[in-house]
């Protein structure tokens, strides 16, 4: 396979003639390039009254490889042929180099160009490209490919340094200017620089632009960036070419695999066009429920210049927002935040005059409970995560998660499987200890911008959140959101989807069909669900809506074996010798649940016993109910630093009601 390399344009802020004077001093050898052992001039001719000069050299290079490799191939050095074509009239130098040694087994071709900057005649541009085609090299093809990449990187890094060194040497000798070439008859100079036209877009990607806008990139990364940029020129329906910052993010997201990044970027560009994302900032208007009840907003800049977005997730009424906005509305809100983030990143980079490529997220989890793990809400969150990761890769620089409560390890287990591993590494977690948390935040936020709700001095303009009034709901019941079915238990697919590290789509893990059961309770009767636990420390979670009248809910642990019930109207409490404190125990206190309330909760099942969920209504009621058992293997050891701050005797979370 032919390997191709391409450098961006390097700009020397010196005239072409002075750069050529410095370039000549690197021959036959120079200390900055010890790999070059000697250069012999084999041809040197001057043409057109000295306007052109063609020089060929045979260069002897040391083999920069392990000793055993050099012994196997039988040589300590190799030879290259270099051909220089200097055009003083047009102020260009083209350099071509090919390998003489092992030319039947490997083909190396390098092309470099020096030319006057098209926009500033007092500056000089340099670009470099190379191809490496290894046909057969004694079974060491992969090793040769790695050495070729290493050599390209070294020569690219050294090239500008060498020219700068010799320009400094000339300056010390009092040479700061070299006259331009003129013909003996004082003829008008030829038009300049036709060769630069084939890389017109690369002029913008010079070394200064990279340092100022993209940060430190290796020569190989620069080459891949240019390769992907050129590939986009061939996209027919491309309305506008993405910025180099965007191209860089997609490359980084695909670990610098150009073909994968190209496919991902093209898919994203189609998605943006289909959904009019480019017009989102201008067209989107925040609904009233977002303005009044969404606890998130932009803050200041962190210490690295990244814009900071604060989300008080623990104060968010997930169910209320989802029922008011719908899945699409919540996704559109998230996309609007992402578009704002890109805008603020660019503004920060321009203002600070340094590379800023992503933003930071500060997530406050105070108040997080099992109500935030409402299944449709989880589905919406995972849909947002998948969409953002596909279309806004590497825009999240750091995620600071603060005041994480005891329920958080369960939530993290569910959600983290859908977050890219590289993105997960950007999460930093702080427990409920605010004093310790402030010290930790000081590494990333200036003290004066630490939010007041975290004990800092800075007031934020972020809404407190709270429950969304049901008058704003577009959907009045779970039936409107999930198809009702009669299946009482969820399939095992949900449990299988919670295997740590396994990434599935949101639809695979959180298909809401077959989850909720509608139950009619007659006056004075109970509804009971028996869970036989064979996995100590697994977590029982529940979510139900009271659709009519009030009811009582209690969780019991049963130590004796209970028979299967054939009649749902019969309660286990009607059995003889069924005595509280003897063979059953109240694990959660009885909760009175009012009409239209939504209840979410969880309980760590420490014992290898049965657990009984019990609903009772004195006057008859209706509810929609879902429960699930999370295996202990899915969260045990996860977030241990957070769990250590919790009481070992406390349950994972108590029931939480939202009205």
Curated annotation (Swiss-Prot):
InterPro entries per the record? CRAL-TRIO_dom, CRAL-TRIO_dom_sf, CRAL/TRIO_N_dom, CRAL/TRIO_N_dom_sf, GOLD_dom, GOLD_dom_sf, PRELI/MSF1_dom, SEC14/CRAL-TRIO_domain
Q: In which tissues is it expressed?
A: Restricted to the developing gut and central nervous system (CNS).
What Gene3D superfamilies would the database entry show?
CRAL-TRIO lipid binding domain, GOLD domain
Cross-referenced SUPFAM superfamilies, in alphabetical order?
CRAL/TRIO domain, CRAL/TRIO N-terminal domain, Supernatant protein factor (SPF), C-terminal domain
Query: PRELI/MSF1 domain: from which residue to which, for each copy?
Result: 3-175
According to the UniProt record, list the residues that bear Phosphoserine.
Answer: 477
Primary place of residence? Answer: mitochondrion
GO CC terms of this entry = cytoplasm; mitochondrion
Which parts of the sequence belong to the GOLD domain? 512-631
Quote the subcellular location field of this record: Mitochondrion
The CRAL-TRIO domain is annotated at 286-462
Which SMART domains does the record match to this protein?
A: CRAL_TRIO_N, SEC14
Report the outcome of residue 245 to R.
Answer: In RNA edited version
Q: What is this protein called?
A: Protein real-time
Please report the organism this UniProt entry assigns to the protein. Drosophila melanogaster
Q: Which gene encodes it?
A: retm
């Amino acid at each position: 396979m032919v390997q191709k390399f391409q450098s961006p344009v390097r700009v020397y802020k010196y005239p072409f003639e002075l750069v050529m004077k410095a370039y000549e001093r690197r021959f036959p050898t120079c200390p900055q390039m010890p790999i070059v052992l000697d250069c012999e001039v084999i041809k040197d001719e001057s043409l057109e009254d000295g306007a052109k000069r063609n020089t060929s050299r045979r260069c002897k290079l040391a083999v920069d490889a392990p000793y055993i490799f050099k012994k196997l191939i039988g040589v300590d050095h190799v030879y290259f042929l270099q051909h220089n074509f200097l055009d003083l009239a047009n102020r260009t130098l083209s350099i071509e180099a090919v390998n003489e040694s092992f030319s039947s087994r490997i083909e190396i071709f390098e092309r470099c160009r020096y030319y006057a900057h098209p926009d500033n005649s007092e500056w000089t541009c340099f670009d470099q490209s190379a191809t490496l085609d290894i046909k057969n090299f004694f079974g060491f093809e992969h090793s040769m490919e790695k050495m070729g990449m290493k050599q390209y990187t070294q020569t690219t890094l050294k090239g500008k340094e060498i020219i700068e060194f010799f320009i400094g040497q000339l300056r010390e000798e009092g040479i700061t200017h070299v006259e331009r070439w003129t013909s003996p008859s004082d003829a008008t100079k030829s038009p300049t620089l036709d060769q630069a036209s084939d890389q017109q877009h690369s002029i913008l990607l010079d070394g200064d632009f990279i340092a100022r806008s993209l940060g430190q990139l290796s020569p190989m990364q620069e080459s891949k960036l240019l390769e992907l940029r050129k590939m986009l020129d061939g996209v027919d329906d491309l309305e506008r070419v993405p910025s180099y910052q965007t191209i860089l993010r997609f490359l980084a997201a695909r670990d610098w695999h150009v073909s994968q990044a190209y496919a991902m970027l093209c898919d994203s560009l189609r998605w943006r066009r289909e959904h009019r994302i480019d017009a989102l900032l201008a067209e989107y208007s925040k609904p009233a429920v977002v303005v009044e009840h969404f606890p998130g907003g932009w803050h200041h800049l962190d210490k690295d210049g990244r814009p900071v977005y604060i989300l008080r997730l623990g104060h968010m009424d997930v169910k209320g927002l989802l029922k008011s906005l719908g899945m699409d509305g919540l996704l559109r809100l998230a996309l609007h935040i992402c578009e704002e983030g890109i805008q603020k990143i660019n503004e920060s980079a321009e203002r600070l005059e340094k590379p800023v490529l992503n933003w930071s997220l500060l997530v406050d989890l105070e108040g997080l409970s099992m109500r935030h793990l409402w299944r449709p809400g989880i589905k919406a969150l995972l849909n947002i995560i998948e969409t953002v990761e596909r279309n806004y890769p590497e825009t999240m620089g750091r995620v600071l998660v603060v005041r994480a409560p005891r329920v958080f390890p369960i939530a993290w287990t569910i959600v983290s499987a859908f977050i890219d591993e590289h993105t997960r590494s950007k999460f930093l977690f702080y427990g409920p200890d605010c004093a310790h948390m402030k010290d930790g935040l000081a590494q990333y936020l200036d003290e004066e911008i630490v939010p007041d709700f975290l004990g800092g001095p800075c007031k934020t303009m972020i809404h407190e959140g709270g429950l969304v009034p049901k008058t704003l709901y577009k959907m009045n019941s779970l039936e409107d959101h999930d198809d009702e079915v009669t299946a009482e238990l969820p399939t095992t697919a949900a449990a299988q989807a919670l295997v740590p590290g396994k990434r599935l789509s949101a639809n695979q893990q959180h298909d809401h069909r077959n989850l909720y059961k509608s139950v009619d309770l007659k006056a004075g009767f109970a509804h009971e669900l028996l869970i036989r636990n064979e996995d100590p420390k697994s977590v029982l979670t529940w979510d139900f809506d009271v659709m009519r009248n009030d009811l009582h809910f209690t969780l019991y642990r049963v130590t004796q074996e209970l028979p299967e019930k054939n009649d749902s109207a019969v309660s286990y409490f009607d059995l003889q010798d069924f005595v509280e404190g003897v063979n059953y125990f109240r694990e959660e206190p009885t909760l009175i649940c009012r009409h239209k309330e939504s209840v979410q909760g969880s309980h760590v099942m420490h014992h290898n016993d049965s657990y009984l969920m019990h609903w009772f209504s004195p006057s008859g009621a209706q509810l929609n109910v879902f429960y699930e058992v999370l295996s202990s293997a899915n969260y045990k050891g996860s977030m241990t630093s957070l769990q250590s701050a919790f009481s070992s005797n406390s349950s994972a979370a108590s029931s939480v009601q939202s009205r």
